[in-house]
């Protein structure tokens, strides 16, 4: 099953809105077939593994990271392929999290005399598809907040300078986070100060660009901003308030961007909880927030954050006039802090990344 999980990871960034799935076929103690789901609309992992195994699939054992589908979508049911191949036993890491189909594939295989066991490497399988699991249950994206700061919690100097806080290896990993995400979100201040492209750049990999999402209540973005001019196959969404200039909206949409008018509160802040429903309806299953201190603070306040990836560089900025990770007023009592769970720590040269979960 561990081999199947590693295979599944090869589909990262390409399978959405489908999950990442890997499959391995074993006969007489030898692997005869391996496969993974390469992209949405392409053959599922089980089919690829069975095709590779050929005649050796008969009387074999299948290891698969997600319950085989039992319905016709963009591809035929995998259960039918498993049955026709003559596979005698199936090990499934996790059931399909979709409440409308959960358990159906397993029960169908059992009804045909195939032995099915579940739960092997369950936690690893759930972690692999954490975004897919949340989306099929809530129709809202799985939200990860990423930031890079000094040891004293500053993400930029008083002048706005932030290039570069972290090392090259840390920044490369961030691009892998972008590749794995359906959408990336920043605020208009980041666009104005940094003029980013918000694309994915990974050496040796044709990475997927996430949908670029910019919070811009008053539609202040320039039509000449790099994010609107750079060549990319991904969409751009500008999230504005409800009373923006229609002339400016038309000007921005001429660049190919889509302006989405959203609810605001206090006359200037996008309602992020409401926005998650809008993004879910647009098919965004996973969202990476790379915004500045105001956007990050708003995301935590709105309760939309599922996961954090905080990078710390061995630098101390000194003073309190820089830009902190979170802006605005914080809690008054330590007991009211947001707790982070299931912590993992990774090293990138001298940088440290803390990964953890909010919910």
Task: Name these PLM-found stretches.
Residues 13-15, 106, 120-148:
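Proteins enriched for Cys/Gly/acidic motifs involved in redox and nucleic-acid/cofactor modification
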Residues 25-124, 211, 237, 244, ...:
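Zn2+-dependent cytidine deaminase-like catalytic core
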